[in-house]
C-alpha cells in the first residue's frame, strides 16, 4: 500500500473510532505463509465491541480439521452469543480460516509449523487496522475444536504468559501414538509455566469408546490432563454425555468457564499500557473439586490424593455448572435475557416498520423476539428450522463445529405491522426470549425521527483498501 494512501486511510479510520457513538466493527486480514511455513494462506477476522475504548483481551476460536470446519471458520467471530461474552469483558472476538496443503491439517495444528506466526502477525495487522494498538499486548482466551483443540493446547505450552484460559474441545497435545514429520507436539512436562494456565478439557462421551475413530485423540487428552493434575495444575475435564465429536451444547460450559476465569486472572485495570500484562495465578485451597467417577463436587480442602481423577473448579458456581453439564449435557439458565434496545418505529400510512438491536443471552442465546402492540402479542421473529441443528427454529443456532448455523446471516431484527391504524410509536414493545423460554422486560418504541436526531453517527466503507475489509453495524 502506498504511504499516502495508508495515511489517508488511517485518518479516515480514526475519525470513526474516535466518534462518541462508536459501533461494533469487524476487520478481516490475510497472512501469506513464510518460506519455512508448512501452512497455506491464513485468514483472520476480528470483531471489536462497541463503546470499548481500550480492549483488555482477545477470545480466539480456532476451527478444526477439514474443509467443512475451515469453510465457516471466520464466522466464529460473528457468533452473537460469544460476542456478548466478549462485550461484557471488553474483549475482541476472533476467528480464523487456515488452509492446509492437501488437507493435511497437521501442517497447522503444530503451531511452530507456521500457524503461531500467522496468528501473531494477524494480531499485529489487525491492531494497526482497527486503531486498537493494545491488541498486540493483551492476553488471550483460546478455544479450539478437534485439530483446533490440539493447536490450543500446544499454544498453551508455547505462550503460557499470554493465555488467560483455554477450552480445548476434543483434543490434547496430540493423538496418542501419533508421529509428525515436522515439528513435534510439546511434552506434558516441557513447560512448568503452562501448569499455571487454567484449562478445561472437554470431549464427547462416545469418543472415548473402544473402536471409535477419535479414541486415540481422546487418549491424548488424558495423557496431558492427568500429568497436569498430578502436578496440581488448575485444570478440569468435562465429559459431554450423549455426545461424540460434535460440539453440541458444550458452549454452555465454555462461555461460563471463560466468564468466571477472566476476572480472576486479569490484572488491575490500572496496569501500565504497552507492556505484556502479568496474569494472576488462580488460588489454591479455596477452590472446588469435581470427582470424575461420581461427579460429586466439594471444597478442595477435602481432597488430598488422586488429583488426576478430579477437576479444579474455581468456585461453587462453576462447580455446579460442571456437575450439571457432566450429568445432563445441559446447564440450566434461570435468568431472563437483557431486553432489546434502540426500538425504532417508522410509520407510513397504515404500515408500521419496527427495527431494534439486541444482545444475545450469554448463557443460552436467543430463541425469538416477541412483538407487542398496546400490550397484545402481534408477532414473533425466530429462526430457520433445521432438523439436526435447529429443531426448535431458534433465532440463533450453531453447527457441528460450534459455528453460526450454515454461515447464514441472522434474520434482521425487523417487523412490519400491516394493521397499525391509530397506533403510536410508544404503543409498540419488543422483548427477547432465550432458549430456556425466559422472556426479558419489554422495550418501548420511539419514533425513527426522534431516534435519528439522538443518534447521528458516521458510516464509512473501507473495503477498497488493499488488505482488509472493515464495516460497522449494531
Segments from the language model and where they lie:
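The feature captures the conserved acid-bearing segment of alpha/beta-hydrolase catalytic domains
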Residues: 164-165, 170-251
